[in-house]
Amino acid sequence: KDNPIIYLKKSDVVERLRKGTEVVLFGNESDLFTREAIPVLFDVANEFDCDIVYYYDSNNISKDNELYKEVINIIGNKRKDTVSKSFTTPVLIFIKEGKIVDYHEGLVDSYDDYTKSLSENQKRELARIYRNGFNSINNGVCERKQQC
């Protein structure tokens, strides 16, 4: 299984959200939700031959007021919790030609027992959500070695 993650520098976050056609993941490696989502994301990215998913640690956004304001301005009202200065991770953003065309925050609504891993049904549901995102940016087509 290929790992498509490319870590973003702070200086690149806003540019990635405003330009091109790509996938950006805001997560937290110590967070259970992010750890549950990553294998599902890798599987779906590989299905689409997507070699690059940009990653930025959401803790860094919360600590940087200027970056936080810029990211929130770009994301708009798509966040579940618009009051808190943090994200419910993971946040997966699908960008096509500089526009957010799909956005998914957290895992799946049915995941309510945080002491357990995602069930197979929940993994399939999350994979379906991620597939919709990949389809929204490339009409189901992502060429090998291309950003998607």
Predicted region positions:
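Structural recognition of the beta-strand scaffold that forms the well-ordered cores
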Residues: 23-26, 53-57, 91-94, 102-103
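Thiol-based oxidoreductase modules, predominantly thioredoxin-like and allied folds used
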Residues: 5-7, 26, 50-74
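Non-catalytic, surface beta->alpha helical segment in thiol-disulfide oxidoreductase systems
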Residues: 85-148
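N-terminal "domain-start" segment that seeds a small globular fold
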Residues: 1-11
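Short, internal strand/loop/helix patches
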Residues: 70-85, 93-95
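Local sequence-structure signature of Cys/Sec-based thiol-disulfide redox active-site neighborhoods
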Residues: 12-55
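Extracytoplasmic/secreted cell-surface and envelope-processing proteins
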Residues: 33-35, 63-66, 101-104
